[in-house]
C-alpha cells in the first residue's frame, strides 16, 4: 500500500493546518486598549496597513531601550488548545496577536514584505538582515522565496515587539534576546476528544486529523528550519494543557515572563 506523501508546497501544508486554526480560534475580538487584535476576519491588506500605522505611531519619538523579551512565540500540538492560550495571553498582556494563517498570508506576498521593511530604519533593518543571514548559515538553510519572505515578515514583527506569534516557525526566526518560546502540548486522548467535541466528528476522524496535521507541521519545520518540532531544546517553556487547562497555562507563561507590566513593553 502506497503511503501518503507529504506535500512540499507550503500552501498545501497550510491548507491541512487550517482545520486546527479553526479548532480553537473562532472569530474572537480581543480588546487591547482600544486596538483591534490581528484577526482573521479582516483582509491581509487591511491587517498590514493597520499594523504599519500602529508601528509608525508608537515609534514616533520613542527612546532607545535595552533589548528585552518583547515577543512570545507559541508552537502547539494540534488539538491542544494552543490558539486559545495565545489569545488569552494577548488579552491579558495587551499584545498584538498574529495567528499562523495571518503570518502565512503575509509571507506569501512580496508587497507585504516590502511594506513592513518601510517601518524599520536602516540600522534596525541591517541588524535584522544580519540575524537572518546568521540563522541561514547556522541551520544550513536553503531559503526559497516563501522562507525569505517569512523570515523577513516575522523578523520585522519581532523587531517591533509587543506581540504573540503562533506557529510558522516563529520561535526559530525571532532573535533569542527578544522572545520567549512556548510549546503547548497535550495527551493524544485529550486532543482527540477536543477535536471530536468541537467539530462533532467521530473519534476515529478526529484522531486522523490530529495525526495528519501533526505530521504536516513536523514536515514544515523540518523542511524550512532543519529542526525537530518536538525537540524540547527548541523551547523555553513547555506546557501540558491536558493537565493545566487553558487559563492556568496562560498564567504560567506570564509567571515565567515575570511581572507582566515589566515585560513585552516598548518604552514610550
Model-derived features: positions:
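Pre-Walker A (Motif I) flank of P-loop NTPase domains
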Residues: 67-72, 161
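Extreme N-terminal, non-catalytic leader segments
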Residues: 29, 33-69
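Short, Lys/Arg-enriched N-terminal segments with co-localized hydrophobic residues
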Residues: 7-36
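Short beta-strand-centered segment that lines the nucleotide-binding/catalytic pocket of NTP-utilizing
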Residues: 96-107
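Conserved phosphate-donor/acceptor-positioning beta-strand/loop module used by diverse small-molecule
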Residues: 177-197, 203-211
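Small-molecule kinase domains that catalyze NTP-dependent phosphoryl transfer to phosphate-bearing small molecules
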Residues: 54, 127-129, 203-247
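Glycine-rich phosphate-binding P-loop
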Residues: 74-89
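ATP-dependent small-molecule kinase phosphotransfer cores
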Residues: 107-162
